[in-house]
């Protein structure tokens, strides 16, 4: 609204920009707060992400007709999230006197993921005149581990004490939440083929 005043005479952002009171006198009306005021506060809204990935492969002819191919890859990821709003933030303007000490909030989250994939295939090929033997033996191994947690706290009367440990309590009726799960996969393969004169297969 271009007609709403959002700064005082000194050029500072004001906290409350407008108040609506019904003409009929019914209801309590509504107060509108200035979101620009929050820019003057010490707030935190950060997300960080680290990712390390590596791939390795080998292709080795051990002897004529015998060949080994293998690969290995892994990924390690870390995520960090932090969100802090002090007690004077407009999000808490309508808190009742009973919840006065709950004003201010900090949400911290952490996550970690580690996964790897390893595989190898040994191939054998032999031929004599019209006789051909072909064999393959291989395996595959995968694992994925994920851990994550979130902590929601409240009660930050001093905006300069902006670390989660300065909270007065966990979120009302809340508790730290997290999850951890692991998945694994193992596979094997093998085959043996014989052919004669490129017409008869076994």
Language-model features: locations:
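An active-site-proximal structural segment forming one wall of the substrate-binding cleft
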Residues: 66
